[in-house]
């Protein structure tokens, strides 16, 4: 567990633990179709691993069963009087977990929002499961016998009229497909593909309703409209395959409320890359309307306890996370805003780091690794306004396959109190502990930053990434930055010196580590050195204003992202529990691997300036060396 220690604040702050430092209106959406009145209610139940192991231990499955058979037995045991079918998408993930999905049926007709998913562990036992099966009264008669439902063409007209879809049915004809009671419409215009219809049940308000599921792809909206099978101008529910979300937050690059105002951010996930293929609100199996998804589960935790699953999260069926904040409010009054900000910052950092190389195989934090390696099932649990402390923050990093945990605290250093969730630098610092602990020594070993100097670098990396990300386009080599200044309400921040390339402003060199006996001071020295690295590379390659890096021949084309990439790659190369010299060498090696050593001299200029010169010899006593390599 790591925190962001407030150096020099022992007398000023009541530290209990070691540590750091208008709602959008519903209506016509910008994408054209307002589906909010038609969204399905949430009915899913989920049994996590601990609960599952206690619930299903009495089940006895034959050793001859494959994982699909085992999953099927669980469903039959849970709902012995119900009918269902196995969905043909079962697979075994790279983490060894088998995934099987089932659809409930009635009279051979799908209940479209009644599902059961079973996950089978490597040992052949049920690992977890979830379901939304309908448990009410089933229809007594088979509707296919009487066929007292409307023609599918009428359902298409009903969907178009009720939802005002930009589709012209003209002389639409329903052409039967191979699947029973499934049709494709010919003779329409306005949709990107021929509309479709399928007869299905849905569960709503405790009852089953027979509907035509009308599928229309109109570009900005790809809709499944559930039209009543008899009253075809009644649309019960609508699903949109095109996900959209709005967040009112301090945008990426704004470190805290002193640097700007909250703004509306739309669909920020990096779906054009591969960092968040399920957006931020899905994990490939479940979609959420709260601040939870494949990468992050963000919630409040006022009690400070270990439980998080059922803690409060903002919930928006329309994915409009728009809440108010002003500096006169107490943290409790803006907890929705704070949780949303934490969710936004951590997800954005996840996507940035993914582009730089912190992927599934490298041990990143994701529930579903989507077949790309690594252990999975280990998204980051991020607690906002955690009640277990104040004036601090921390992050716990177990090995790959187990959840990381971030605890963000309120700060009693100002009136009203301030929320660390609103200072991006603190959030980024903490998440970087997860990065460095997963990369140094490999994702299966979280014990490679335990020695004093190595642990100090763990703190320094956090400050480095926090500072690199907050740089502004008009900053120069002479720009200085502090850490934790807003949250701590402390001019000059919580470190001994601000981060600066000016030796008078920040005189730290490697030799200063000699007299230090705690990780945060050592970390400030390491981050000071990396700040020199950062600006030398920006001076060489410029600084992009884009959130995501642009790559040329595999390397970021701008200096800021190149620095973040080389530092990250260096973590993967260095030994378990490295010292400064080994970390320096690993960064140089990372540049050799990435750019064939094009930046060696710019890097060594930074290291030698702060005492880690070419002729430095590591020993019990740290003595500065300011020499440059002969070939520079």
UniProtKB/Swiss-Prot annotation:
First-level EC class: hydrolase
SUPFAM superfamilies assigned to the protein according to its UniProt record, in alphabetical order: Metalloproteases ('zincins'), catalytic domain (SSF55486)
Cofactor note: Binds 1 zinc ion per subunit.
Disulfide bonds: none
EC nos: 3.4.24.-
Gene Ontology terms: cellular component: extracellular region
Binding site for Zn(2+): 429, 433
One of the protein's GO biological processes: proteolysis
Entry similarity comment: Belongs to the peptidase M36 family.
Described function: Secreted metalloproteinase probably acting as a virulence factor.
Protein's UniProt name: Probable extracellular metalloproteinase 2
Organism: Arthroderma benhamiae (strain ATCC MYA-4681 / CBS 112371) (Trichophyton mentagrophytes)
């Amino acid at each position: 567990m790591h925190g962001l220690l407030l150096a020099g604040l022992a007398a000023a702050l009541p530290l209990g633990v070691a540590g750091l430092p208008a709602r959008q209106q519903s209506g016509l959406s910008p994408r054209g179709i307002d589906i909010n009145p038609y969204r399905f209610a949430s009915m899913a139940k989920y049994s996590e691993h601990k609960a599952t192991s206690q619930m299903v231990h009495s089940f006895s499955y034959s050793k001859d069963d494959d994982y699909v058979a085992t999953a099927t037995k669980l469903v039959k045991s849970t709902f012995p009087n119900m009918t269902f079918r196995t969905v043909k998408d079962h697979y075994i993930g790279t983490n060894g977990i088998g995934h099987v999905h089932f659809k409930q049926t009635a009279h051979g007709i799908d209940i479209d929002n009644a599902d059961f998913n079973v996950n089978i562990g490597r040992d052949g036992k049920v690992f977890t499961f979830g379901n939304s099966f309908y448990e009410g009264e089933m229809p007594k008669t088979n509707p296919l016998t009487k066929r007292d439902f409307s023609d599918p063409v009428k359902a298409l007209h009903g969907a178009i009229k009720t939802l005002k879809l930009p589709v012209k049915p003209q002389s639409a004809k329903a052409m039967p497909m191979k699947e029973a009671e499934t049709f494709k419409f010919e003779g329409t215009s306005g949709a990107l593909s021929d509309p479709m219809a399928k007869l299905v049940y849905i569960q709503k308000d405790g009852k089953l309703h027979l509907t035509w599921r009308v599928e229309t792809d109109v570009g900005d909206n790809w809709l499944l409209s559930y039209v009543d099978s008899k009253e075809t101008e009644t649309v019960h529910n609508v699903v949109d395959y095109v996900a959209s979300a709005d967040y009112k937050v301090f945008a990426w690059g704004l470190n805290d409320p002193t640097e700007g105002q909250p703004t509306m951010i739309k669909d920020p996930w990096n779906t054009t890359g591969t960092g968040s293929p399920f957006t931020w609100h899905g994990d490939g199996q479940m979609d959420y309307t709260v601040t939870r998804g494949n990468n992050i589960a963000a919630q409040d935790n006022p009690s400070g306890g270990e439980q998080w699953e059922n803690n409060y999260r903002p919930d928006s069926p329309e994915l409009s996370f728009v809440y108010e904040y002003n500096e006169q409010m107490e943290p409790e009054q803006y907890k929705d805003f704070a949780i949303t900000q934490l969710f936004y910052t951590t997800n954005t950092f996840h996507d940035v780091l993914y582009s730089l190389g912190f992927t599934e195989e490298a041990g990143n934090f994701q529930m579903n690794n989507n077949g790309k390696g690594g252990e999975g099932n280990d998204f980051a649990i991020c607690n906002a306004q955690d009640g277990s402390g104040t004036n601090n923050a921390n992050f716990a990093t177990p090995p790959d396959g187990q959840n990381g945990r971030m605890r963000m605290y309120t700060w009693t250093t100002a009136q009203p109190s301030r929320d660390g969730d609103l200072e991006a630098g603190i959030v980024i610092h903490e998440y970087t502990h997860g990065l460095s602990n997963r990369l140094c020594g490999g994702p299966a070993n979280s014990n490679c930053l335990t020695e004093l100097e190595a642990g100090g670098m763990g703190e320094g990396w956090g400050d480095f990434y926090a500072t690199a990300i907050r740089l502004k386009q008009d900053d120069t080599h002479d720009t200085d930055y502090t850490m934790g200044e807003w949250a701590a309400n402390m001019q000059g921040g919580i470190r001994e010196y601000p981060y600066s390339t000016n030796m008078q402003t920040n005189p730290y060199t490697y030799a200063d580590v000699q007299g230090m006996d705690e990780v945060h001071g050592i970390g400030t020295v390491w981050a000071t050195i990396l700040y020199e690295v950062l600006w030398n590379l920006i001076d060489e390659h410029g600084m992009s204003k884009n959130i995501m890096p642009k790559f040329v021949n595999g390397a970021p084309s701008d200096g800021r992202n190149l620095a973040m990439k080389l530092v990250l790659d260096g973590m993967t190369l260095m030994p378990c529990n490295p010292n400064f010299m080994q970390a320096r060498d690993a960064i140089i090696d990372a540049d050799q691997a990435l750019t064939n050593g094009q930046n060696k001299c710019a890097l060594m200029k930074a290291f030698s300036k702060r005492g880690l010169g070419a002729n430095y010899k590591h020993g019990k006593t740290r003595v500065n060396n300011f020499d440059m390599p002969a070939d520079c």
